[in-house]
Amino acid sequence: MWQERLAQLVTTCHWIGAKGWAPATGGNMSVRQDDTWCWLSESGRDKGSLTTEDFLQVEIATNQAPSGRKPSAETGLHTLVYRLFPEANVVLHVHTVNATVLSRIEKSDTLALQGYEMQKTLSGQHSHLDTVPIAIFDNDQDIDALAARIADYAQTRPLRYGFLLRGHGLTCWGKDIQEARRQLEGLEFLFECELMRRRYEP
């Protein structure tokens, strides 16, 4: 099953690369193998031309890659999602312009999305009248410290669909490739709408 997800993820990475959502080898993507292992894109690889050989097996509990090759810098964020959400089988981390800029414009620790029909692309959302909170965390080169802050947040506040890293990008997930891809595309559309609203509304 995970082998099929990995093959689908490679196709999704090519789609992400074509959209310019992971420029200059940025971003990283993974699939869960089981409760112990995941497969994560290798550091420094162009996402538009990845193959299955560009993914490393990583232990979820330790962030270690038995092969000795270097997984992506944000490995600890992927494994955190898999530990926090047993239902998550795919994690996508992208560096889109909309996510990067909006995360800097919004000064609070939460981006509130409300009033958009496309909120319904997110699993469990049924109305544009609902408010969808997307957590924002200050960026940190110490990924272990960043992951610890996110884990602490998740103990007391809902963390659904994804989160933003200020001035960095978006991390989102899903139970399968289709859900993760839909939620990435939906959030990216909503971020663009919110940026335009803030630009044009008095």
Swiss-Prot record:
It catalyses: 5-(methylsulfanyl)-D-ribulose 1-phosphate = 5-methylsulfanyl-2,3-dioxopentyl phosphate + H2O. It is an enzyme of class 4 (lyase). Keywords: Amino-acid biosynthesis, Lyase, Metal-binding, Methionine biosynthesis, Zinc. HAMAP family: Salvage_MtnB (MF_01677). Catalyzes the dehydration of methylthioribulose-1-phosphate (MTRu-1-P) into 2,3-diketo-5-methylthiopentyl-1-phosphate (DK-MTP-1-P). It comes from Klebsiella pneumoniae subsp. pneumoniae (strain ATCC 700721 / MGH 78578). GO terms for biological process: L-methionine salvage from methylthioadenosine; pentose catabolic process. Binds 1 zinc ion per subunit. It comes from the Bacteria. Zn(2+) binds at residues 93, 95. This is Methylthioribulose-1-phosphate dehydratase. NCBIfam families: PRK09220.1 (NF006672), salvage_mtnB (TIGR03328). GO terms for cellular component: cytosol. Belongs to the aldolase class II family. MtnB subfamily. Its cofactor is Zn(2+). Its EC number is 4.2.1.109.
